[in-house]
Amino acid sequence: MFQTESHPAGGSPLQSIRSSCDRCRLQKLKCTVQSMESDGRMVCERCVRAKVPCAFGRRRRASRPSDTKKQGDSSTRRSTAPRTTNPEPTVLTPPLSTTSSTSEQTLGGATPSPTLATSSALEAPLETLAECEPDTTAPTYSYHHHHHDSYQLGEGPPTPFPNPATTGGGSGSSMMDWDWLEQDFHANELYCLDPELLASAPASTSTSTGSPTAHHRALPDGGSGSSTMSMGGGADTPFSTTASVAGRRLPALIAEMQQRLEALENGAWLHDGAQSFDHYPIGAVLRLSQEFGALAGQVLGMAATYGGGGGVPPSDVAGLQMMAAVGGGGGLYELGRGGLAEGGSSTATVLLVLGGYVFLVRLYGLVLGHFHAHLNRIPSGSLGGHMHSTPAPTTSPTLQLGELPSGGAMPDVSRIHAALGMLLAALHSVEEQLGQGGEVAREMVVSILTQGSGLEPAKLQDGFGDLGEKVRSVKELLREKMGL
């Protein structure tokens, strides 16, 4: 397998045969010549055992140039240096020099610019530029760096996401601006827990400076709704500001509902190993219900006031249902302009109200499921047939189930009984604004859908019917555990 390479006699770079075969040299192993074949080829032991061809190559002359050759190369480079073209004035500066020379000619300068000779170098053939060695001098870096900085510091191409620092504010109208959030939405009030307040508070009242919960408060004696809102719909009223705040607050509130729902779903409340429900966050659920009811009442109050022309309060569910059924006939919806009538709540805000109610129903369903599972783990007993527990004097977002008052020999059952009453009272206040099962908001959305797509309201199914079944199931378990 050994083959000698034929080269001219005077310029052959090959020398003597190597002492190790190519295979051993590649694997960096010791090569031991075993025998010499009849044709003159040498074979090593490893190649014989591996039954592979064994080839011994020849050494090559060193490629390192001698001192004489180095001197000759340096003199050759010096002699050919004047014939090379300097790439610095040819490649980098022509764009700038061409601009300057053009401007001077435009201004009518009599003396030609010295950069014209440089700009004429642009006409040099590409072969001349290709012969030049690449140069990485400072002007090359400074030119490109300057060009990059000018692009970065400039206005640049238009972007669909404006920069608040350059647009001069305007972030107040953005839904992602959280500066308008209030830290305290009066969640400590008991307006939704007292039946007398629920019956006496006209939900259509509101002020421009009041909190969202002021939507449920009664007017002062002798006051009327005409002092705080306009029935015409053409003039500026406090409702426009209130609806704007409600429309901006609803997405954040729905996000809080989703976070609370995920936190309760991932908790240990459904496991048999849960020792106690004392730390169950009942106050957070109550706060979400109360705040959502206030915001929903404001949004639907705007729709009723400006859409129907009659100033129907949101608590008048029958009036809102009639207006929603009439639809475009009462001026409530004008789909040609993409929303409700001018001055009323937008279609997107009404959809947010319905979406928030969906999350609230899911949240209540999960809480009732936790109560049901916890009551199943408690042995049945008797509390004497009566419960004398009252709600806590104050309710806060941090209220826990263990902080509720308890009575009798079964404190867990009595606390769940009190918590269920508070939750149902809060849900009742929400349904006073939205109707039973969110019927008012659904009728408004259905009216939009039927006008836009021709759907029949009878074909839309109610997806919240199982919530009443869960309430009845928990009540039956409470009666069973209490021995009633």
Swiss-Prot record:
Keywords: DNA-binding, Metal-binding, Nucleus, Transcription, Transcription regulation, Zinc. One of its GO terms (molecular function) is DNA binding. It is found in: Nucleus. Residues 64-76 have a biased composition (Basic and acidic residues). CDD domains: GAL4. One of its GO terms (cellular component) is nucleus. This is Transcription factor cghD. It comes from Chaetomium globosum (strain ATCC 6205 / CBS 148.51 / DSM 1962 / NBRC 6347 / NRRL 1970) (Soil fungus). The lineage of its organism: Eukaryota, Fungi, Dikarya, Ascomycota, Pezizomycotina. The gene is cghD.
